[in-house]
Amino acid sequence: MENDTVSEMNQTELQPQAAVALEYQVVTILLVVIICGLGIVGNIMVVLVVMRTKHMRTPTNCYLVSLAVADLMVLVAAGLPNITDSIYGSWVYGYVGCLCITYLQYLGINASSCSITAFTIERYIAICHPIKAQFLCTFSRAKKIIIFVWAFTSIYCMLWFFLLDLNISTYKNAVVVSCGYKISRNYYSPIYLMDFGVFYVVPMILATVLYGFIARILFLNPIPSDPKENSKMWKNDSIHQNKNLNLNATNRCFNSTVSSRKQVTKMLAVVVILFALLWMPYRTLVVVNSFLSSPFQENWFLLFCRICIYLNSAINPVIYNLMSQKFRAAFRKLCNCKQKPTEKAANYSVALNYSVIKESDRFSTELEDITVTDTYVSTTKVSFDDTCLASEN
């Protein structure tokens, strides 16, 4: 979501210092290389998996690709330059690099924030308004929204081209070059505060409210409430399965439903909580420094704040993608990992409006893959292996 802080932090690091402790340099380089390296690989895999696998091109995955690209920008533009900063103690990318790298930092963070907001709204519509979702949550609409998100953030972040410049400080034994600002802190502080509100506070409030509605649906609506829908699903089940249902299997299915829905809700809570916590130190620092005459610039705390941001960008593939069976299978296929032969994949998946729809339908989302045992069990359906499955062969 944001890097208003990242740019300021890079400037903070480059403030005149007699020397940077060797242990600080080593820790910085080690952490940045590991976290950013793994994050870059993970986000690239997300993009490749969705682009190369036809059945993965869903509206939800479209937002995940946008988020992965934004996280790549954050990791590359905001993370990797810290290595050269730690080694040389000075800005080595020149004036053009100062403009472009800072621009990409802000673009990646703000686009990440907007992508998460768009994804949150899409999840809310898909789960809480499944009828509307069939024409609102489409692949073509998702692409248009993403184009708008990137166009908006690209234009918005251009203001930094007019605020940045190289600052040169001369000392006895060295000349330190920093990527800084042309204007006083009193002028750019309002910009940071605006970014804090637009790209952090508002998305977090919106996510909290919408995920609250999602949790209410998942917890308080364990079975379909429409008798006609129940009757229709029962008739469809009777064609393909035994008419005599076992009560024990029904209980197992119900327990599986409750457990699955709790798991989904936990995942949604983790998404919100991690995003809020990992961005909070950096955002809080920016807000506090905006009101201080002399900004707080302790190196180790600044490093902690940056590492939190890099972790947020690196961990997103784990949170959003590795909880999906389809993504795991696509990852293994991409890595050419050998898999045991399995039964043919089901041709149908269960939507959260308790109706069965084809996977090729435009309203196909990844959350349904996560909750494959979550919605259809209310009809006491028994699969061929005596477990609760939400698909038909």
Swiss-Prot record:
UniProt KW keywords: Cell membrane, Disulfide bond, G-protein coupled receptor, Glycoprotein, Membrane, Receptor, Transducer, Transmembrane, Transmembrane helix
Residue stretches in coiled coil: none
Membrane topology value: Multi-pass membrane protein
Recorded GO MF terms: thyrotropin-releasing hormone receptor activity
Cystine pairs: C98-C179
Spans within the Extracellular topological domain: 1-28, 84-99, 169-193, 289-296
Predominant cellular place of this UniProt entry's protein: membrane
Gene Ontology CC terms, in alphabetical order: plasma membrane
Keyword Glycoprotein on entry: yes
Segments on the Cytoplasmic side according to the record's topology features: 52-61, 122-144, 216-266, 320-393
Segments traversing the membrane: 29-51, 62-83, 100-121, 145-168, 194-215, 267-288, 297-319
PROSITE patterns reported for this sequence: G_PROTEIN_RECEP_F1_1, G_PROTEIN_RECEP_F1_2
Record's subcellular location: Cell membrane
Presence of keyword Glycoprotein: yes
Residues linked to a glycan: N3, N10
Domain of life: Eukaryota
Family label: Belongs to the G-protein coupled receptor 1 family.
Free-text function comment from the UniProt entry: Receptor for thyrotropin-releasing hormone (TRH). Upon ligand binding, this G-protein-coupled receptor triggers activation of the phosphatidylinositol (IP3)-calcium-protein kinase C (PKC) pathway.
Protein name (record): Thyrotropin-releasing hormone receptor
Species whose genome carries this gene: Mus musculus (Mouse)
Lineage: Eukaryota, Metazoa, Chordata, Craniata, Vertebrata
